[in-house]
Amino acid sequence: METHSELWSLEAIKEVYNTPIFELIHRANAILRSNFPHSELQTCYLVSIKTGGCTEDCAYCAQSSRYQTHVKPEPMMKITEVLDRAKQAIRAGATRVCLGAAWREVKDNHQFDRTLEMIKGITDMGAEVCCTLGMLTPSQAEKLFEAGLYAYNHNLDSSEGFYKTIITTRKYEDRLRTLDIVEKSGLHVCCGGIIGMGETVEDRVELLHNLARRERMPESVPVNVLWPIKGTPLYDQASISFWEILRTIATARIVFPQSMVRLAAGRAFLSVEQQTLCFIAGANSIFYGEKLLTVDNNDMDADTAMLNLLGMRHRPSFSMERGQPCQSVTC
């Protein structure tokens, strides 16, 4: 039997991406329905526990200290503040809480200790917790696991070739090494990328191929659409079409049949009808709440109304145990 990496060559993924749109959506929807309960949507709430002041030069990011944007460095949030926001989000229907910090890497200090306490507190509320904190060591990953962390987010962003044009302060190999550490710790991997940065279709295909070559499939694959922010190098980047977004979502669903495919940043650009097409084509996770780190997101009440309109229900927390790898299947 072919392994997942053998099955999904660059050529095979590109062929899927370029499939006629009706056939592509039909295939992706069939795979979604065969692997997940019908009409179930994961709702994630994102909290920026440390905003701004990042030393990296990611061309898309408002939190870089190298650019003059609307974002100013803020002190790290207090534990009680984060727990209060998490509690409100869970009451509103969120089943995963994601904690983000504008760090290049995790440091063994009081801020990391505070993050561990946040994880413990939110886990005790019955929600999954995901963190995106930058690069980390094996011992730090172990501490996160012991604190109850469910998943760790570390995106590849794009293909290795295109990556070099948007980030110079961190190598692609550094990101792959971080994913290795997360996988070995027993934590679930949340890893995807950003589209609409000026990359080609080949770059998007290579991003998915790099993920498909991993020993374990990611638990979540977030698909972010660039939100151009004034002051960043990509502010004047032309928008991509909705059909490119839809093709990326559907291709990700086909390549990663048992992973959550998250319609992440940029969703606020899409109408309810466009979002519905993305759900039909394989997206089964969204960020729930008015803010995604530094950019706007859909209003929570509007999202609740959309879910009710579509007859969708919230995916329960801990539908997959920690340490349980996502098994690839041939589709």
UniProtKB/Swiss-Prot annotation:
[2Fe-2S] cluster binds at residues 98, 130, 190, 262. PROSITE patterns: RADICAL_SAM. Pathway: Cofactor biosynthesis; biotin biosynthesis; biotin from 7,8-diaminononanoate: step 2/2. Belongs to the radical SAM superfamily. Biotin synthase family. Binds 1 [4Fe-4S] cluster. The cluster is coordinated with 3 cysteines and an exchangeable S-adenosyl-L-methionine. Binds 1 [2Fe-2S] cluster. The cluster is coordinated with 3 cysteines and 1 arginine. It catalyses: (4R,5S)-dethiobiotin + (sulfur carrier)-SH + 2 reduced [2Fe-2S]-[ferredoxin] + 2 S-adenosyl-L-methionine = (sulfur carrier)-H + biotin + 2 5'-deoxyadenosine + 2 L-methionine + 2 oxidized [2Fe-2S]-[ferredoxin]. It is an enzyme of class 2 (transferase). The keyword Chaperone does not apply. PANTHER family: BIOTIN SYNTHASE, BIOTIN SYNTHASE, MITOCHONDRIAL. SMART domains: BATS, Elp3. Its EC number is 2.8.1.6. Homodimer. This is Biotin synthase. Catalyzes the conversion of dethiobiotin (DTB) to biotin by the insertion of a sulfur atom into dethiobiotin via a radical-based mechanism. GO terms for biological process: biotin biosynthetic process. Transmembrane segments: none annotated. GO terms for molecular function: 2 iron, 2 sulfur cluster binding; 4 iron, 4 sulfur cluster binding; biotin synthase activity; iron ion binding. Its cofactor is [4Fe-4S] cluster; [2Fe-2S] cluster. Residues 39-264 form the Radical SAM core domain. It comes from the Bacteria.
